[in-house]
Curated annotation (Swiss-Prot):
InterPro entries assigned to the protein according to its UniProt record, in alphabetical order: Papilloma_E4
Keyword field contains Ribosomal protein: no
Region (Disordered): 15-54
Localization of this protein: Host cytoplasm; Host nucleus
Taxonomy of the source species: Viruses, Monodnaviria, Shotokuvirae, Cossaviricota, Papovaviricetes
One annotated GO biological process: symbiont-mediated arrest of host cell cycle during G2/M transition
Protein name: Protein E4
Organism from which the protein derives: Human papillomavirus type 6b
């Protein structure tokens, strides 16, 4: 059998056989648990007779339009100087 150092010079990957195994990386900290929230459906609010906690009051004389689709809500109004303001919420 040939000398080990000669083998290691000829085949350097043999050195890998004698290296200690790598330690696994430390685990990432877990994310905090998400609190459970009850989703209310739109018709649940209509069935309850209790008023809203904060009444919705819009201090303007100009009317606004509300358009809805299955995935968005668009509210449009005009300011006193004629600027059109559009707010779109995409779900």
């Amino acid at each position: 059998m040939a000398d080990d150092s000669a083998l290691h010079k000829k085949y350097p990957f043999l050195n890998l056989l004698h290296t200690p195994p790598h330690r696994p990386p430390p685990l990432c900290p877990q994310a905090p648990r998400k609190t459970q929230c009850k989703r209310r459906l739109g018709n649940e609010h209509e069935e309850s007779n209790s008023p809203l906690a904060t009444p919705c009051v819009w201090p303007t004389l100009d009317p606004w339009t509300v358009e809805t689709t299955t995935s968005s809500l668009t509210i449009t109004t005009s300011t006193k100087d004629g600027t059109t303001v559009t707010v779109q919420l995409r779900l």
